[in-house]
């Protein structure tokens, strides 16, 4: 694993492959550029994770900055995201601003955190969310954990991915027909890796 701790700039290295019979491939060269993070954020709990760079990118683009305790930042990669948190980050990633509102119109408005209300209204107005039908009315359920299926629907609507033929993709059972198109669409553009998650995992919370 190439881990040039504290290094910046460009580098390259050349390699060959040798098979069991001693045949040597033509050399191949890999060139890399290591740039300093603009945000100054480096997560203490993401060392060695392939997702560390993506986590830092979220901070640099103002989408999400983890908790700062003392002089260290923590991304908390195992913490399950709430519906409100995911919708807010998804909208921020697409440069969709939160509405300046005090009330959302959802029946569970009182339980929606103040910071999430503007995002809830923006998401509703943009057709990104429609809420959950309950006996009391349509609820946003900002504090509930968001599942991978629900997240796929949100991202599909935000990205406006062209619908694909469902028969070409490994989508889910009849119980998840409501999200199958979104999942297949995201698989077609490599947002979700086809076959990576089981049906049960797609129903689990996003971390």
What are these model-derived regions, one by one?
Residues 1-36:
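Acidic, turn/loop-rich segments in luminal/extracellular domains of secretory-pathway
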Residues 35-52, 65-87, 91-118, 129-149, ...:
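Feature responds to low-complexity, polar/acidic, surface-exposed segments characteristic
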Residues 56-61:
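Mature N-terminal segment immediately following signal peptide/propeptide cleavage
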């Amino acid at each position: 694993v190439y881990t040039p701790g504290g290094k910046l700039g460009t580098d390259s290295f050349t390699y060959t492959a040798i098979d069991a019979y001693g045949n040597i491939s033509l050399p191949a060269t890999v060139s890399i550029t290591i740039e300093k993070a603009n945000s100054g954020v480096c997560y203490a709990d993401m060392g060695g994770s392939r997702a560390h760079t993506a986590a830092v990118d979220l901070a640099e683009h103002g989408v999400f900055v983890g908790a700062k305790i003392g002089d260290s930042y923590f991304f908390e990669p195992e913490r399950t995201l709430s519906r409100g948190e995911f919708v807010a980050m998804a909208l921020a990633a697409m440069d969709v601003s939160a509405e300046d509102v005090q009330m959302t119109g959802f029946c569970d408005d009182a339980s929606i955190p103040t910071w999430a209300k503007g995002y809830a209204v923006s998401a509703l107005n943009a057709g990104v969310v429609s809420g959950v039908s309950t006996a009391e009315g349509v609820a946003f359920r900002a504090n509930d954990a968001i599942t991978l299926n629900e997240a796929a629907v949100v991202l599909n609507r935000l990205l406006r991915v062209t619908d694909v033929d469902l028969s070409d993709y490994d989508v889910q059972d009849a119980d998840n027909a409501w999200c199958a198109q979104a999942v297949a669409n995201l698989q077609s553009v490599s947002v979700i890796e086809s076959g990576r998650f089981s049906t049960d995992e797609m129903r689990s919370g996003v971390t």
